[in-house]
């Protein structure tokens, strides 16, 4: 493989579906501009078409109430061009048919966003420069400052200069209010936010009282304040299932090494295991039509499971990166050692490829099928994927 072949290697993510339509994010390297290009593709009536591309990056698509309404984040692309603005602007757009409307814009990054239950508002999680840095013109050239010497042990690297905030945005009027100020509450990052029976609930990171490490907490937003629900674990991917708050992660952060799993969180802050006997890492969970689906790791693969009925939806030598639902159909982003990212329709455990995202790459680069082998060392068993050669392979 030549290094320039990577120009045609596409990484797929953020697959969403509604009605008969799919939208996916595709990211690839660009050696000419020394940056990454992120685009959106849309599948309607069985055909894929470029949805958003150009001089900016487009990411994190979400459907509105109607099938023809799609929200997405637009970010100015980082390139080695001194004539371009040094400010990083992130914007949420709403596209209904051919009409494009700007909903929200901020200097910094938009980590995530979600629509309110009534569809009238939007909750936006941002990662912005802390107040001490906001007046510095060229922030990328500013030297590093360490607030805490053991910053390498907080699992986040150098995070001295950003704080996370939450905005509530009226989609029709575009007016917004900052309901969580990360500067005043010293919130380093917000992993997840969900609206449900407890109102708005979020998982977030703050330094502990000694400033030696980050603590991951879950709290409910009440009048711009955060009422702490739980602070002993390491959790994200908040969601409601059967009218109860759930999360994916560990009940106690120092239980590692152990499996990340689905946890149920009561109104009083008690945390219990949803699947106590399931001994695999669960990495993502989502509820669709009252059924809980999750991705879990097993022997070097990532598979999709119906957690409500305790049924594996696929048992192949593939890694499922993401999944989405479209009417009564299930679609996944899957890859293997010999097949880079593609989108497949999943039906009765069988995968049918419906995309050609990496067709150009696989024509240029020869790939190999790897074999799975569990090797017994006498003291432990090791899951191995490889190309076994020689007469004793």
Predicted features along the sequence, with ranges:
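Multi-bladed beta-propeller domains
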Residues: 1-12, 41-59, 85, 91-111, ...
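Beta-strand-rich domains and repeat architectures in extracellular enzymes and scaffolds
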Residues: 4-38, 189-191
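Non-catalytic accessory segments flanking enzyme active sites
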Residues: 13-14, 125, 132, 159-160, ...
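Blade-terminus and WD-like Trp-Asp/Gly-His loop motifs, strongest in beta-propeller folds
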Residues: 15-21, 60-69, 113-121, 192-199, ...
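Beta-strand C-termini and the immediately following turn/loop, strongest in propeller blades
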Residues: 23-32, 71-81, 123-129, 156-160, ...
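Structural motif
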Residues: 33-39, 80-90, 132-134, 163-165, ...
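Predominantly five- to eight-bladed beta-propeller fold
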Residues: 39, 127-169, 215-217, 352-357
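Hydrophobic or amphipathic alpha-helical targeting/insertion segments
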Residues: 70-132
């Amino acid at each position: 493989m030549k290094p320039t072949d990577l120009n045609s290697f596409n990484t797929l993510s953020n697959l969403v579906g509604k009605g008969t339509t799919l939208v996916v994010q595709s990211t690839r390297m660009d050696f000419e501009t020394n940056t990454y290009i992120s685009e959106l593709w849309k599948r309607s009536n069985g055909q894929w078409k470029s949805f958003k591309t150009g001089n900016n990056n487009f990411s994190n698509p979400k459907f509105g109430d109607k099938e023809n309404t799609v929200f997405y984040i637009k970010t100015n692309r980082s390139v080695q061009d001194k004539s371009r603005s040094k400010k990083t602007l992130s914007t949420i757009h709403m596209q209904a048919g051919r009409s494009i409307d700007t909903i929200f814009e901020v200097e910094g990054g938009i980590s995530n966003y979600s629509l309110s239950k009534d569809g009238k508002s939007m909750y936006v999680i941002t990662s912005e420069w802390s107040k001490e840095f906001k007046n510095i013109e060229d922030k990328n050239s500013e030297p590093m400052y360490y607030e805490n010497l053991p910053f390498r042990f907080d699992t986040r690297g150098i995070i001295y200069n950003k704080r996370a905030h939450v905005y509530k945005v009226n989609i029709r009027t575009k007016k917004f209010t900052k309901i969580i100020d990360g500067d005043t509450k010293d919130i380093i990052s917000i992993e997840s936010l969900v609206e449900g029976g407890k109102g708005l609930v979020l998982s977030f990171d703050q330094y502990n009282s000694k400033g030696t490490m980050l603590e991951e907490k879950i709290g409910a937003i009440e009048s711009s304040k955060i009422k702490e629900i739980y602070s002993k674990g390491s959790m994200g991917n908040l969601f409601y299932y059967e009218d109860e708050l759930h999360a994916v992660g560990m009940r106690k952060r120092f239980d590692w090494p152990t499996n990340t799993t689905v946890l149920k969180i009561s109104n009083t802050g008690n945390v219990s295991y949803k699947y106590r006997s399931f001994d695999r890492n669960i990495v993502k969970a989502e509820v669709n039509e009252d059924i809980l689906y999750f991705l879990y790791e097993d022997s070097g693969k990532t598979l999709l499971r119906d957690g409500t009925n305790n049924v594996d939806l696929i048992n192949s030598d593939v890694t499922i990166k993401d999944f989405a639902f479209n009417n009564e159909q299930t679609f996944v982003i899957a890859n293997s050692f010999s097949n880079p990212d593609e989108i497949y329709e999943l039906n009765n455990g069988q995968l049918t490829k419906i995309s050609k995202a990496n067709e150009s790459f696989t024509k240029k680069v020869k790939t190999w099928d790897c074999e799975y082998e569990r090797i017994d060392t006498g003291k432990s068993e090791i899951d191995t994927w490889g190309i076994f050669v020689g007469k004793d392979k």
